[in-house]
Amino acid sequence: KLAVVSDTNTVEAMGRRVAKELSGWADVEEIIFPGNTHCDEPTIALMKDRTRHCDGCVVVGSGSLSDTVKYATFEDGRKYVSFATAGSMNGYGAGTASVTLANGYKTSVSAHAPRAVFVDLGVSAVAPPWLAAAGLGDSLCRPTAQVEWWAAHRLLGTSFAQTPFD
């Protein structure tokens, strides 16, 4: 059984179509989260609970929803694939997830990469423009963050790990 996870912003854009196409060869359950879903500890726990009876997940959405499914399936040892609906981040295929902790801090945590990432350019092209702007910012800041972390390690002796950048 597959869980096709989308949100109220992406279910009509692509979620329902993906679920319909997959239902031809697998038992599919559509799970729809609110459009303002954040990747935080309570939402990850809810995702694990709502998808626990499924063998794998198909996420149809942008950054927060994708990271929520990514981390939930990582913790459960299940596989997932991603249908990106906007160019809002550069981490769809990454082995890390951005999670907001209980203390309010957002951090990158080890997770696992999807088995595949699919992008329908027609869907991404009509996504709100601010999502594309966010993705550009995400892509531009990554190398700067890597250099700053490495420099702090070399100059101040703080820890450094290459893994998030691989």
Kindly give the residue locations of the regions a language model identified.
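Alpha-helical scaffold segments in soluble metabolic enzymes
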Residues: 17, 46, 71, 135-142
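A short, small-residue-rich loop immediately preceding and capping a beta-strand
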Residues: 51-85
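A short, well-structured juxtamembrane/interface segment
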Residues: 1, 165-166
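Short, amphipathic alpha-helical segments
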Residues: 41, 59, 63-66, 126-134
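Short glycine/serine/threonine-rich phosphate/pyrophosphate-binding segments
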Residues: 11-14, 62-71, 89-93
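Short beta-strand/turn micro-motifs composed of small residues
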Residues: 6, 61, 119
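ATP/NTP phosphate-donor binding region
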Residues: 1-56
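A glycine/threonine-rich phosphate-anchoring loop and its flanking beta-alpha core
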Residues: 75-165
